[in-house]
Amino acid sequence: MNQKVMLVEKERFLLNDNCKYMITGRVSKEADIECYLDGIRLPSEANLITVMTGFMRAVETKNPGGKWVEVLVTLPENLQNYKKLQVYAVNGKERFLWYKMKTSDLMRKQGKPQLFVDGESIVREQKKVILAGWAVGTTPVSLQVYDENKKPVKITLKRNTRMDVAEMFRECEVNKDCGFHIQAENVSGKKAYLVAKDENGKKAVYQIGISKGERFKAKASLYSKKAMENYRSNGIHTVIRKSLIKLEALSKGDGLYQTWLKENRVTKKELNQQRKTVFRENIKFSLVVPLYKTDKYLLKALVDSVLAQTYSNWELCLSDGSGADSPIRSILEEYQKKDPRIKVVFNEKQLQISDNTNAAIGIATGNYIAFADHDDTLAEEAFYQMAKEISQHPEADLIYSDEDIIDIRGNRLFPHFKPDFNPDYLCCVNYICHLVVVKRTLLDRTGLLRPEYDGSQDFDFLLRCTEHTDSEKIRHIPKILYHWRSHEGSTAGNPDDKPYAVIAGEKALAGHYERMGIKAEVEYTGCPVVFRTRFVIEGDPKVSILIPNKDHTEDLNKCVTSILERSTWKNIQIIVIENNSEKEETFHYYEELEKRYSQAKVVTWDGPFNYSAINNFGAKYADGDYLLLLNNDTEVITPEWLENMMGYCQREDVGIVGAKLLYPDNTVQHAGVVVGIAGFAGHILTGYDRYATGYLWRLATTQDESAVTGACLMVKRSVFEELHGLDESFAVGLNDIDFCLRARALGKLVVFTPEACLYHYESKSRGLENTPEKKARLQKEVDHFRERYRDFLKKGDPYYNPNLSIVRGDCAFRMAYEKKDEIV
């Protein structure tokens, strides 16, 4: 057996059975699993895992050849009479000790609620503790914070939905609102405790370090406990191997970025040419940076990156919020003497981030204001590229760039290749982030940063900026012009380790909707700094669902039943469009369907198969305010799917909304369409796990897209009529993409939301394109699409990024071998 592939990732008891113990990990492909308690064989079952997490994929990439399994061991009730559980990977006479655990350790885990803290923040001056995480049990779980004397303290508790957690516990139904945000007040002493308690009195406890010493001890205790559990279970070699696998997997992924950098790095010749370039416009950048006891090495790196700029009309405005005894005062005074473009305001009082940034803005004289953090750096061409963009688009009010992350040594990692301005994406997560440049006139209209939003002050500021300008005046430069430092304590290092930022972000987004006059509820998703919006539906609009069908009554019945029995929205009309069915039982089913459901109606299309014409025909019988095109091989998962789609579709600026579609194995089939992939259009991030977040949260966030699939597509009736329905020259393929692009040409947004989720048993509607005739028909429509949208294809999809692959659909980096002219 290949012992190098052996690995245990996690273990736990089933919530609803104290005798069922589950172990998840990796073994060699040929291995079977055997479980023993003090040498006595235990009943167990090992199930193959086919849908892998990101970590599992990384391990497979680095070290292929194993299989991932979920082992369920049945333990005796009298566990106290035994000493040790041992689990072996077995192949013939070969045996490998895969996992072991003392029964005393097992018994400590039995029957308790599951408690996990994603992040914690300690505000010592205010005696405040902020916690974020999740807790589940077989009965409702209460949460309370206690001080070091075990006395309860006042808390504000907010629950949030964590579908990713609910999916983990498949053995029983758990509360999907198992996520939490807790703000505890007046927490004194050196430590505190978060206690999760179920209705049976069983407790799980998380220790919170308040003082710096206790925080260190608490973290050290947690890490050492995990390491010792791993050591006892797997041995020191497995502990080391697991750590190395994680590091090497990351290194391998980063290696692709290093290759991309070599192929795309700006040359010295180009930098020299930039220095010689003179723009007619008077563009002066003021880079404002709040400082607080900044590490001198990091401060030097920042200042040096500004001094190295190829565009010279800038000023660096620094505000030292360290207070009267600032440890960096002398070095800042030296910088001021070194270059008159470096300006510093020294503050006698310590300042928080917003007030500190505002102080820097107060000394800025540029007509464009740029923002940076005190431990980050700029690319050498940052200001040049910004000036070039402004010169070409002088109407621009706000410009942002791509960015990557650098570690403490300056190694470049994890590029953020962003889309062009995407307002619905921004309302889920601050994807814009850095580098941001704002025209002074927009800043004056918007106002300064607001201290009450500290932690998400930049998110609040960006949202307010969008309220005071037009979308066309927000520009994106698809170049990496900013390097975001990742180290302990930075948001780049762990964005979810600052729950106060989440609370401020939620407040900022709610305020944005209120100012815009939009009725909506905002909720944190549990995914780091990602929010979801629930719009209030206006009135009681009807949704007419159009379902083309040819035979396949079993699929159709599953689809219709799921709509009418699972949907929480009840004002529904279902129009089944019969087209060329051949089986007699199909027509018997239609009769039964109309008798069973008053909302259902069957109409007959007599012509040859033409998806566009069939839906246009069905739409004539619809009397809904919204039309929803739906394949017959779909099944509703999310009960609130229609509300979530209508919430966006009812907005004046939105024309079309698409849903997240899954294969039956709970992997992604559709999460938006990128126009240009494979030379015409394609889905992205297919095959990822249902709850994976995807590249830059693309699977977990609502976004504006160029197109969505017609397998589940909602459109305003007025927009459908203005477009005269689907274009019937696209009989089989690309009719949905063409429909979306024509809606965008009307100035309407096309929105993808993962909050509406369905299964899609793809291709059952009409079969695969697997005959020469069908392939020729599809190719003809592809050629037609390419000709119609030639200019769009050349420019590239604005909601994608030219640095990402248009050959693959997994948001891989676009390498030199991808030549656009060979594809379009």
Spans of model-derived segments:
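Basic, ligand-binding patches in group-transfer machinery
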Residues: M1-T238, V278-N282, K300, V529, ...
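N-proximal low-complexity "stem/linker" segments adjacent to membrane-targeting elements
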Residues: N230-S305, A510-E565
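Conserved donor NDP-sugar-binding/catalytic core segment of glycosyltransferases
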Residues: E381-L413, H487, T634-F680
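A short, conserved alpha-helix in the catalytic core of glycosyltransferases
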Residues: L442, E452-I480, L509, W641-M645, ...
